[in-house]
């Protein structure tokens, strides 16, 4: 079976071809269009892999994408209903990036763009979405482990922001997850923006900035995220508005009352900003350690696979290695929730 994994609505767009379970090609669009972390539809990648008219797509049995848009619509609807009337702001295009607006109608958009290459009469292979965090968990398949615990943490997927999986042999299985609003990744991103940097991009700068701060805000930052039993946690939404306004107004007045006004982009970095960065990093590491300690107590296994955007946080990875004392695998490309991850999960499901 030949499976084509395709990413077209988020950063790091590209494709992967899996043939009888073996990767034959993994190609990110940025290698061709020279735009780092590009969100462009991978037109050049498709042409490179299948020819100018896409004729080679006839040899593909299944196309898969790392977003289950039906599941995302359901969970988006729940968030919308829970936050009425203010959550109606989430229906405004400006409350999300253009790419996130596209995800909810991904299959239709994908078919239309592929037919611009192949022509309208071309019969495309069926398009099968897989869960976003499932695709992240596919990092296990490129690990050297026969079994492992798998932690997926990012901004949000189609139904979760944190997911715990068990990996064994050629299968991964989700054990539990946290919903899309209780998102450590979104907290990190919106505090990054508060500190005057670009969200969904400059989180690494804030991680580095944390080394220059002190612990004066750590205790207050723990008020934002509560640790619960069984390795779970909850974000105190009295500090955050992203469940009602998205990116338009992600922080509440309560947040500003505690931490002060936001730093404008390019503004002077005050000691207060450094302390907020320190607190953000310290609490992030603490939450991840809380989750991992519980997941390993529930399923003892010395091997851990870490995937999703949080896997890009060096401080988190270092803290995990110091705490666990065992192997912590971070894939060479933690954004494996892309084309290859989707194709690997589709193979596990038999392409169905």
Identify the residue ranges that each predicted region occupies.
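Short acidic/glycine-rich loops and adjacent helix/strand connectors
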Residues: 1-352
């Amino acid at each position: 079976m030949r499976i084509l994994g395709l990413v077209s609505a988020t950063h790091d767009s590209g494709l992967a071809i899996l043939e009888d379970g073996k990767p034959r090609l993994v190609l990110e669009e940025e290698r061709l269009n020279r735009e780092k972390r590009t969100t462009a539809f991978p037109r050049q990648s498709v042409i490179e892999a299948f020819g100018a008219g896409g004729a080679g797509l006839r040899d593909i049995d299944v196309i898969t994408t790392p977003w289950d848009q039906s599941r995302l619509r359901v969970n988006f609807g729940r968030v919308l209903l829970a936050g009425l009337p203010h959550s109606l702001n989430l229906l405004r295009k400006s409350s999300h990036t253009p790419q996130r607006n596209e995800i909810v109608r991904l299959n239709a958009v994908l078919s239309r763009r592929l037919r611009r290459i192949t022509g309208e009469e071309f019969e495309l292979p069926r398009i099968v979405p897989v869960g976003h965090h499932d695709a992240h968990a596919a990092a296990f398949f490129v690990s050297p482990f026969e079994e492992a615990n798998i932690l997926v943490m990012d901004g949000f997927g189609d139904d979760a922001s944190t997911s715990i999986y068990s990996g064994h042999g050629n299968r991964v299985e989700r054990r539990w997850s946290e919903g899309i609003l209780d998102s450590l990744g979104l907290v990190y991103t919106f505090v990054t923006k508060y500190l005057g940097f670009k969200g969904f991009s400059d989180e690494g700068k804030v991680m580095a900035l944390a080394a220059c701060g002190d612990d004066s805000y750590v205790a207050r930052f723990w008020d934002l995220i509560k640790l619960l039993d069984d390795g779970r946690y909850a974000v105190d939404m009295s500090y955050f508005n992203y469940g009602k306004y998205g990116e338009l107004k992600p922080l509440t007045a309560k947040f500003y009352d505690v931490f002060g006004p936001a730093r404008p982009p390019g503004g002077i970095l005050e000691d207060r900003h450094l302390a907020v960065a320190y607190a953000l990093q310290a609490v992030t590491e603490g939450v991840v350690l809380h989750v991992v300690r519980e997941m390993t107590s529930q399923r003892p296994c010395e091997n851990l696979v870490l995937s999703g955007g949080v896997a890009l946080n060096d401080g988190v990875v270092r803290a995990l290695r110091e705490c666990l004392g065992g192997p912590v695998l971070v894939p060479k490309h933690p954004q494996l929730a892309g084309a290859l991850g989707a194709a690997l999960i589709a193979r596990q499901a038999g392409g169905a």
